[in-house]
């Protein structure tokens, strides 16, 4: 057995999740695109290190930094509940490169109806893969729920994009560039609640500070879903608001007029730069383990908690991603 102590809690993130900075550092690590370049052997090696450590066996010569690195590599590629390897584009580390490409193309090809429909469909197809790949083991998504959310979000995104596109025909060109963002925001408002409809029906687990389960709350589920929608829309704002303003200016310059083929790669690059920061920072807006005051819970659950322990004022829940 190595010298590394066995009391390091790798079930939790490395950094303090009660602070924004701690959450941001955690998500910068989780969404690191470099994890996509790791080989199957490297992923298996990290899985072995993590599983052995959880079983009480530290790999000889292993340092604490190496343990945490293995933990984050493992978390980036394997489902936390099932232990299955997640499909490559469904991993959190694929968020930046995939969204960079899709969002860049949505912002570039926004003028013609066929390309608007195509890229909104591609975006919602990618979202469906991510949502299915990162589904909760506690509240699994059925194929029917996934299909309903996918069709509804795609329809909502396309309808919003085409509706606003027709309304902006007589407005300044810059306004038209923000149509894809409005479509993405509308799709998030449809997609996420539908994907998590079971939680809205039966509630999500709420616990005391020590993690003891106290019951299920629909109110907590609504708050958690609202926080996730805000985070997802927040992620899109810098990537879909800053590049259009820059590109609207650059496209008037002779440099891009003589080289129009540079427009798409330049737009994708600008989106990627924004997403590298926006994705982890917006994931960190709200604590993963969020809280809600007991007085805001359903009357039955509130009475149940007060009967068990009248001193409990606040309960906790996992908001999801």
Swiss-Prot record:
GO biological process, one term: one-carbon metabolic process
Membrane-crossing residue ranges in chain numbering: 146-164, 174-194, 225-245, 266-286
Keywords: Acetylation, Amino-acid transport, Membrane, Mitochondrion, One-carbon metabolism, Transmembrane, Transmembrane helix, Transport
Expression sites (tissue/organ): Widely expressed.
The keyword Membrane belongs to this UniProt entry's keyword annotation: yes
One Pfam short name: SFXNs
Membrane topology: Multi-pass membrane protein
Localization annotation: Mitochondrion membrane
Residues that bear N-acetylmethionine: 1
InterPro entries (UniProt xref): Mtc
Protein role: Mitochondrial serine transporter that mediates transport of serine into mitochondria, an important step of the one-carbon metabolism pathway. Mitochondrial serine is converted to glycine and formate, which then exits to the cytosol where it is used to generate the charged folates that serve as one-carbon donors.
Name of protein: Sideroflexin-3
Species of the source: Mus musculus
Lineage: Eukaryota, Metazoa, Chordata, Craniata, Vertebrata
Gene: Sfxn3
